[in-house]
Amino acid sequence: MTFDDKKGLQVALDQAKKSYSEGGIPIGSCIISSDDTVLGQGHNERIQKHSAILHGEMSALENAGRLPGKTYKDCTIYTTLSPCSMCTGAILLYGFKRVVMGENVNFLGNEKLLIENGVEVVNLNDQECIDLMAKFIKEKPQDWNEDIGE
């Protein structure tokens, strides 16, 4: 793990904690360029905004605003949890070359598809990410199941 990965995951984890404190699903994400500029950050807001699509990664993209697509090719997207199918699609669409996740214990997303498409996938197995997500799933299983399409 590099300093950049620690920094990036901490930004994403802070977003996850913010979502949890708002009564939402504790998944956070951020987009950091190669010069360590945070271009966008966000958290899952499906509950807070009654949204079908505002997962953590989608929220970070939304909050980055309108940027040229090529911008993302030089960025790493950090997420506290393995990306789902929808977020994986967005990662591939915008050409991210690197994804760093906090964990994939509570949910195993589409890491294989990312790797098959040339994206570097790094799993930090962060215990704080694992514990926060597990706590939420235990407290609100119906909200979690809705978030993952079950």
From Swiss-Prot:
Query: Cellular component per GO?
Result: cytoplasm; fungal biofilm matrix; nucleus
Q: Which Gene3D superfamilies match?
A: Cytidine Deaminase, domain 2
Cofactor names from the entry are: Zn(2+)
* Protein name from the UniProt record: Cytosine deaminase
- Name the Gene Ontology molecular function terms of this record: cytosine deaminase activity; diaminohydroxyphosphoribosylaminopyrimidine deaminase activity; zinc ion binding
GO terms classed as biological process: cytidine metabolic process; cytosine metabolic process; pyrimidine-containing compound salvage; UMP salvage
Instruction: Kindly list the positions annotated as binding Zn(2+).
Output: H55, C84, C87
Q: In which pathway does it act?
A: Pyrimidine metabolism; UMP biosynthesis via salvage pathway; uracil from cytosine: step 1/1
Q: What is its main location?
A: cytoplasm
Q: Where does substrate bind?
A: N44, D147
According to its UniProt record, this protein's enzyme class is hydrolase
Q: Where in the cell is it found?
A: Cytoplasm; Nucleus
Organism this protein belongs to:
Candida albicans (strain SC5314 / ATCC MYA-2876) (Yeast)
Family the entry assigns: Belongs to the cytidine and deoxycytidylate deaminase family.
- The answer to keyword Kinase applying to this record is no
Task: Identify the gene encoding this protein.
Answer: FCA1
